């Protein structure tokens, strides 16, 4: 986050513009990264006999089937990435794509975390820390989205991409910023 703010300041680009780009990269990174949980045989859900299940063999050769939460989250994030990509050209304000990412990820993470067996709990309560953070993230992002769209009513010409004129390319074809 600090690097993003420094880059925004140095390049004179509004931070929400960079957050929109970061959100797209992070969600596809999470989609791919969850497969590391599969390779490590970790972060799976509870024992299940559901249609989608992942078999893990213990040292004695006994196979137990678990919810493949890595797969659920990977598919959830892939759907989110596709949705954000399609939506990104229709956004009404800078930062909207990032807020949608946070809301989407929070919603999915709250659901998927409920299936996992290796969760960290808040003190001695039955509240999972990741679920709490996910729900708060979803509510905050959805609240900010609603507030901006209903109260501020942003216009498409307010988007940074629509305000900044295209920079001319140098005669040799190289970027003029170098």
Where are these regions (language model features)?
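A feature for loop-to-transmembrane-helix boundaries and adjacent hydrophobic helices
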Residues: 1-178
